[in-house]
């Protein structure tokens, strides 16, 4: 599969194909579960509506994130990861020399509490360092963890928030095509579209739905399901006039947890397709492969 050949646009007739939408207000848990399974098998992505996360909470979280990226560079760089640090947290700016990704981003561990490092929380805007932002983040985390457990379980997972900032640009690609290392990602965005997914040899736009949560299946759930659920290939497209932002929450196994095909999903007629590895080893191998490519 040569993804690069179709990096810019799919035929207009295909762009109208809709990403699955799952309505969590449906009183039938069986129907909701069926919809999640079907979307995960066929697409590896779906949009959740009526998910229970208050729209006002999502708005407040986005407002504070936008304010941070509008600060002077010196303010943002005050929470940059030190050069000798192994942390994945902090502010990261785009590298004009590499041009593989055209976004700035800010990363926070948000769950469990023992993983949170406030050294990477900005002092400005004031809502970031005060009780306001922390309370909003805690409330949002509670909602997201509850939502994740409702969809797939995973009470022992780790949660990482990544805020992506794509300023207006004539560049076509904001983030190149990739699948996520994690188990799954729960993403919200501002009103500027740009997320695309690859299916049936074409790229499809993900429709913006106000207050929806986009769920993307990652590598670990794909491996645990022995390939039954797709780890969706996706990318981000820039807008020439408007700033696009997104707030994915990455749901990850603990670093030392061994992840591989579940025994109940394998057998003589369906042998394991993937090697069982600790999540840490998997991430290391994938990073090495990405760097080589």
Curated annotation (Swiss-Prot):
Under Pfam families, the record lists: 2OG-FeII_Oxy, DIOX_N
UniProt: 2-oxoglutarate binding residues: 164-166, 244-246
Matches recorded under PROSITE patterns = FE2OG_OXY (PS51471)
Pathway noted in the entry: Secondary metabolite biosynthesis; flavonoid biosynthesis
The molecular function terms of the Gene Ontology recorded here are: flavonol synthase activity; metal ion binding
The cofactors it requires, by name, are: Fe(2+)
- Gene3D superfamilies in alphabetical order: B-lactam Antibiotic, Isopenicillin N Synthase, Chain
Per the annotation, how and in what number is the cofactor bound?
Binds 1 Fe(2+) ion per subunit.
Q: Which reaction does it catalyse?
A: a (2R,3R)-dihydroflavonol + 2-oxoglutarate + O2 = a flavonol + succinate + CO2 + H2O
Q: What is its EC number?
A: 1.14.20.6
Write down the InterPro entries for this protein, in alphabetical order: DIOX_N, IPNS-like_FE2OG_OXY, IPNS-like_sf, Iron_ascorbate_oxido_reductase, Oxoglu/Fe-dep_dioxygenase_dom
Q: Which keywords appear in this protein's UniProt record, sorted alphabetically? A: Iron, Metal-binding, Oxidoreductase
Residues in Fe2OG dioxygenase domain copies: 156-253
Detail which positions bind Fe cation.
Answer: 178, 180, 234
Q: Which family does it belong to?
A: Belongs to the iron/ascorbate-dependent oxidoreductase family.
* Protein name in the entry: Probable flavonol synthase 6
Q: Which gene encodes it?
A: FLS6
